[in-house]
Swiss-Prot record:
Keywords assigned by UniProt, alphabetized: Cytolysis, Disulfide bond, Hemolysis, Host cell membrane, Host membrane, Membrane, Periplasm, Secreted, Toxin, Transmembrane, Transmembrane helix, Virulence
GO cellular component, one term: membrane
Self-association state and partner proteins as the record states: Monomer and oligomer. In periplasm, it is present as a monomer, while in outer membrane vesicles, it oligomerizes to form a pore structure that is active. The pore is formed by a dodecamer.
Pfam families registered for this protein in UniProt: HlyE (PF06109)
Molecular function GO labels: toxin activity
Family as reported in the entry's similarity comment: Belongs to the hemolysin E family.
Protein name: Hemolysin E
Compartment(s): Secreted; Periplasm; Host cell membrane
Post-translational modification: In periplasm, it forms a disulfide bond, which prevents the oligomerization. In outer membrane vesicles, the redox status prevents formation of the disulfide bond, leading to oligomerization and pore formation.
Topology versus the membrane: Single-pass membrane protein
Length: 303
């Protein structure tokens, strides 16, 4: 009977640690890397580079899009930081949990139970906070997607050859070309006419086609960005769904852990299984913290 109770305790405790570890591992390997933020950083720089290539109306939309993308990134990394905080607490608690197996007694068993429930409880709290941040991040992406649709319509109007914006760009090119021709006029009575003729050929044959190609590349850039933002929004929604499942699983195992008797006679194999599960989660936490550029304070204890 005692052995059956011990087996049940080991199963519950091991499952509790592995469930928490699984949620963290999911965040570490999937949720936290689902958006290519380096690409988005480069994109935000490109938004500024193109600022001379669209009308004032389009410029306002671009400013809105840039703000929304930056807001989304802030909230996404806020979620990441929340999970980082859970790791900081969990590594300390699990290291203490492992050390309590030394000269095991009922008091230490009770402390282990408190520790494990604390790890699970903090996990639920922090992952729920991360979930809320991801929701806001997703909303910003969704709003940016709407602005990009409006921008595409605006750019289509701006870049139409009959639009006032397009004509203003052509007039600017012609003015600069003819001013240059006048400044470098060839000597003689027909010099200005010749220079203007050359300028006209350059404007109509080269500069205006170049303008069309440049404007086309600008619109293509924003079309690509629109597709990327839509995909990012879908990815975050999928991430939130996965995280919801993990939070529910932790909640279920926490309830079972609270009603489980911890002070039982463990054999060597049982102890090994529990220590291995705790060490694995500590390693997952360390991996997460190191990947986020901060020094890990707690390593797996020698036991």
């Amino acid at each position: 009977m005692t052995e059956i109770v011990a087996d049940k305790t080991v199963e519950v405790v091991k499952n509790a640690i592995e469930t928490a570890d699984g949620a963290l591992d999911l965040y570490n390997k999937y949720l936290d890397q689902v958006i290519p933020w380096q690409t988005f950083d480069e994109t935000i720089k490109e938004l500024s580079r193109f600022k001379q290539e669209y009308s004032q109306a389009a410029s306002v939309l671009v400013g809105n899009i840039k703000t929304l993308l930056m807001d989304s990134q802030d909230k996404y990394f806020e979620a990441t930081q929340t999970v980082y905080e859970w790791c900081g607490v969990a590594t300390q608690l699990l290291a203490a949990y492992i050390l309590l197996f030394d000269e095991y007694n009922e008091k230490k068993a009770s402390a282990q139970k408190d520790i494990l429930i604390k790890v699970l409880d903090d996990g639920i709290t922090k992952l729920n906070e991360a979930q809320k941040s991801l929701l806001v991040s997703s909303q910003s992406f969704n709003n940016a997607s709407g602005k990009l649709l409006a921008l595409d319509s605006q750019l289509t109007n701006d870049f139409s050859e009959k639009s006032s914006y397009f004509q203003s760009q052509v007039d600017k090119i012609r003015k600069e070309a003819y001013a240059g021709a006048a400044a470098g006029v060839v000597a003689g009575p027909f010099g200005l006419i010749i220079s203007y003729s050359i300028a006209a050929g350059v404007v109509e044959g080269k500069l205006i086609p170049e303008l069309k190609n440049k404007l086309k590349s600008v619109q293509s850039f924003f079309t690509t960005l629109s597709n990327t933002v839509k995909q990012a929004n879908k990815d975050i929604d999928a991430a939130k769904l996965k995280l919801t499942t993990e939070i529910a699983a932790i909640g279920e195992i926490k309830t079972e852990t609270e009603t489980t008797r911890f002070y039982v006679d463990y054999d060597d194999l049982m102890l090994s299984l529990l220590k291995e599960a705790a060490n694995k989660m500590i390693n997952t936490c360390n991996e997460y913290q190191k990947r986020h550029g901060k020094k890990t304070l707690f390593e797996v204890p020698e036991v």
